[in-house]
Amino acid sequence: MNPERWAADLVSNVKDYGKRIIDYAHEKTSNPQPVTVHTTNSAKGRLGEFLYQNRVSVGLGSAALFLAGLSYYKRYDYVRKRRAPRAPNHQKTQVVVLSAWNPLASVIAHDLDRRGFIVVVLVRDASEAATVSLQQRPYIQSLIVTHNEAVERFLLSFSNQSGPKEYALRLRGLILVPTGDSLYTPIENIGKDAWISAFQQLSESFSNVSRMIPLLKSQKARIIGLSHGILSAYEPPNYAVPSILSSSIETFLRTLKRETGLQVICIKLGNLSFLNYDHSSSPGKSNYPPSLCTERKVLNKIFDSLLGCWPSPTRHVGCRTFFMVTVSRFLPTCVIDGIFSLFGKFHFFSCSLIKRS
């Protein structure tokens, strides 16, 4: 084969092929054909189209389903049975300590006893111990904090236990119960004795908690504090003593958590008043009977804080308390002062904002 002839034929073929490609491209550009798009009528496409066309109805329906589910869960959580674990022989082994004895502590003690706890109440003297014994509940016991020997025996009773672990006593937590009433009282009517009594009771409760810290650490127990959340958030006029006490309790709980590393839970109440409420009497005979629904919410949250896996450090009783405490964080001080001045002029404040039965 002649190499020159072969090279000439190759060049000629390449030129012809390039000319055909150029002619084909020119033909396509001069006479464009419509591009047909094949849409797939799949189930996913139909579902997306339906959701888009009915987005308003779908949104309202989703919101209704969410609210219905939330309402059902709230109702179930409100009525579900809560009981403390017991030993194999059905003996009570879970212990809870109350920092003081007052009508609110009485309500909590009776409820914890009913749920399967052993309740130990820290009292100041024999008269308070006699009051606790009048409850006639074998698992609600008193411990006089001024008797050092009795306190030491109680502290050592958890470490000097023999036998299987299932039968051993376990300290679950200590509940700091607020003292003092939250009645509407102008500050000029508060005498020296009232101030001294309120802060003395508060300091005794703090001292009792401090004394129990080594035992709480060894038992990995929790500290639960109750405070009037609305009062500490707004510090309204004519509620000087309860506002100061509530703020002091919350500050004490935050300090405890940072200093000791214990699990500390603050339950903020909607300013419930149990001081004139007798748990054993009928509701008609009590001067300030609390709402049964709100009372049960408080007791349920105390139980969940004692035995829950991951308790929140701050819990609110009721949506109203949560809403008002949350709003107070964003309101400037001047706005709150103006609102209180307006309420003070028209005497609305004691009825519309704080009172809750």
From Swiss-Prot:
GO MF, one example: oxidoreductase activity
GO cellular component: cytoplasm; mitochondrion
Phosphoserine, modified sites: S282
Record carries keyword Endoplasmic reticulum: no
BP terms from Gene Ontology: steroid metabolic process
Keyword rRNA-binding: no
A Pfam short name: DUF1776
Compartments reported by the entry: Cytoplasm
InterPro entries xrefs: DUF1776_fun
Record keywords, A-Z: Cytoplasm, Phosphoprotein
Domain of life: Eukaryota
UniProt xrefs under PANTHER family: 3BETA-HYDROXYSTEROID DEHYDROGENASE DHS-16, SHORT-CHAIN DEHYDROGENASE/REDUCTASE FAMILY 9C
Family: Belongs to the UPF0744 family.
Protein name: UPF0744 protein C106.03
Organism: Schizosaccharomyces pombe (strain 972 / ATCC 24843)
